[in-house]
Each structure stands twice: as structure tokens, then as C-alpha cells.
Regions:
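Active-site bordering "gate/hinge" segments
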Residues: 1-153, 160-161
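Long, well-ordered mid-to-C-terminal structural blocks that present hydrophobic/aromatic surfaces
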Residues: 157-168
Length: 168
């Protein structure tokens, strides 16, 4: 291991929404994230391993065991990469699990599902409600109500309680 960098980010957002009916909705949104980046050098190759995690909670999320596991994972990944062969190229099936792939889906598909894009009619999905826009077997769900998860909230930015919503 040649170099280790750890980055801790923490924020607390306080929001208050007033609607036209005079209803006030408030929320406090803590968010914390720790990233561990390791550079390993072996046989003339320098490779990187990254691990970490976060949640909508406070510093208590980072137990000694959890942080050590992230560090070990980053080291393992960096060292393993120094021995890795090039990945095959070409078209192949991809399976995405829960968690971070949600960011990829959000960037690739999610922005086109946001209300402002539909209001401006700039989304590829404009006018597609009720139509199939993905192959059978593909389901994309937005669930902002999962406790403690980075994308979870008590209420959205309009003051509406979050829920599980099937997008596609």
C-alpha cells in the first residue's frame, strides 16, 4: 500500500415548506459519508481501491468495525487490481443490485422522469405515461421511505411524505 486517503463529509439540511393552503412542513436531513481510497503498488503497477459508505444519520453510523471493514475492502480491491487481467469487451448482460447502481440509473434515466423535464417537454419520456419504455422484466422503483438510506427523506421538497413509487 503506497497511499491512503480518507474523506469524511457531513451535512445537516433544515427545510421548511409552506403550501398555498397554509400548511407548514419541516424536516431535518442529516447526511454523512466516509470514503477510503487506497493506492497499492505491486510488480510495477499502481492501482486504486475505494470503499466507504454513509447514511442519513450522524457520526454514530461509523462504528470501528464498519470503518475497518471499509478500509480492508479498499486495500483488498487495490491489491487485487494489481493482478487483474483486462476485462472482456463486447455486448453482455448487466445485472445491477441495490445501492450505488441507483446513482447510475438516476443519471441515465432519472432526470428524464423528473417533473420539470416533463413540464418543459424536454424528456424522452414526455407523453409516455402508460406506455412500455423498457423491456419486460425491467422495473425501476424510487423509494424515498427506506430508513437511513442516502436517498431517503421523510418528506420531499414539496412537503409530501415519501413513498415507494414504481417509475418504470
Amino acid at each position: 500500500v503506497r497511499n491512503v486517503t480518507a474523506t469524511l463529509q457531513a451535512e445537516i439540511e433544515t427545510m421548511l415548506v409552506a403550501d398555498l393552503a397554509g400548511r407548514l412542513t419541516a424536516d431535518i436531513r442529516p447526511q454523512i459519508y466516509l470514503s477510503v481510497n487506497v493506492l497499492a503498488e505491486q510488480n510495477g503497477r499502481t492501482e486504486q481501491g475505494t470503499s466507504g459508505g454513509g447514511a442519513r444519520c450522524g457520526i454514530e453510523h461509523f462504528t470501528r468495525e464498519r470503518v475497518e471493514a471499509w478500509c480492508e475492502k479498499a486495500v483488498r480491491e487495490a491489491v487485487l487490481q494489481t493482478e487483474a487481467r483486462p476485462a472482456p469487451s463486447g455486448v453482455m448482460p448487466v445485472v445491477l443490485g441495490p445501492g450505488w447502481p441507483g446513482i447510475l440509473l438516476h443519471e441515465a434515466v432519472g432526470h428524464g422522469l423528473e417533473a420539470d423535464a416533463h413540464r418543459k417537454e424536454t424528456s424522452v419520456f414526455t407523453g409516455c405515461i402508460g406506455q412500455r419504455v423498457a423491456p419486460k422484466g425491467v422495473t425501476i422503483v424510487d423509494d424515498g421511505s427506506l430508513p437511513g438510506r442516502r436517498g431517503s427523506l421523510t418528506v420531499d421538497d414539496e412537503g409530501t411524505p415519501t413513498q415507494r413509487t414504481v417509475l418504470i
